[in-house]
Amino acid sequence: MSWFTPEVIDVIIQVVKAIVVLLAVVVCGALLSFVERRLLGWWQDRYGPNRVGPFGMFQIAADMLKMFFKEDWNPPFVDKMIFTLAPVVAMSALLIGFSIIPITPGWGVADLNIGLLFFFAMAGLSVYAVLFAGWSSNNKYALLGSLRASAQTVSYEVFLGLALMGVVVQVGSFNMRDIVEYQAQNLWFIIPQFFGFCTFFIAGVAVTHRHPFDQPEAEQELADGYHIEYAGMKWGMFFVGEYIGIILISALLVTLFFGGWHGPFGILPQVPFLWFALKTAFFIMLFILLRASIPRPRYDQVMDFSWKFCLPLTLINLLVTAAIVLYNTPAVAAQ
């Protein structure tokens, strides 16, 4: 009797696909470091990395070698177990969160009926990594940075969820593939859910702690925040995890508001991966452009903006969407 039944072969294929997708995300997260520096140099009219290899293309390899050979040192005053666990949780939570993204009709790690809820579970888990890092470091700057980061992340995750509820109400499902297919038959949600998109994008930048919402890592105030005691590969996991977060939020924007793997007006349906990659790359570059062009506000301004602007906007968007859906739903005759 052969072990390789059709069911076993299907499981093996799905596992291989999952490994390929997640490894590709990690590699892209590492490469984004080089892409960001090149784009910042171009936009700010200066040289980017241009010494290692042609056009500085091997700079990322040099950075990785430097990181691998740095001493993996634990300060004597830290809580070693939690100190080591924090970067692992930070990177793995975001990487697992990417598993719900449908890249093409046939490629994706997991097709969950509660896909969006699973994403929020992983996003909430990443908050613990920041708290672990700040508390276990026994450093006042690290603790202040982690408190800032956790308060900011928890606040903006509220609006992240409320911004998506308009999409869920219209589709009637938390499944990511259902949302993509709904947009293929109707308008992309960037039009009917424009205010939800704006709020989701702002909250996504804040949750990933990217400029201008990088107050938890403000060098001038907190000396790099909760990262301050980390070095070597532990710091590298935080570093790559941040870029994985950028890729994840960009992929979610594409999936939820820009039709996923579908092209505009049904153009070139034969290349779904190309459309998904191009749209995701656009939002990644938009993240980088924000760093190059917008100053950092004060921390109290960031929190005021969340509760005084984002909350009313998301609630109004959700109420209007619910009213429209209710109006367009045919009344059920009383039995």
Curated annotation (Swiss-Prot):
The chain crosses the membrane at residues 15-35, 81-101, 114-134, 154-174, 187-207, 238-258, 270-290, 307-327. It catalyses: a quinone + NADH + 5 H(+)(in) = a quinol + NAD(+) + 4 H(+)(out). PROSITE patterns: COMPLEX1_ND1_1, COMPLEX1_ND1_2. One of its GO terms (cellular component) is plasma membrane. Its EC number is 7.1.1.-. It is an enzyme of class 7 (translocase). One of its GO terms (molecular function) is quinone binding. Signal peptide: none annotated. The keyword Cell membrane applies. It holds the Pfam family NADHdh. NDH-1 is composed of 13 different subunits. Subunits NuoA, H, J, K, L, M, N constitute the membrane sector of the complex. Belongs to the complex I subunit 1 family. This is NADH-quinone oxidoreductase subunit H. The gene is nuoH.
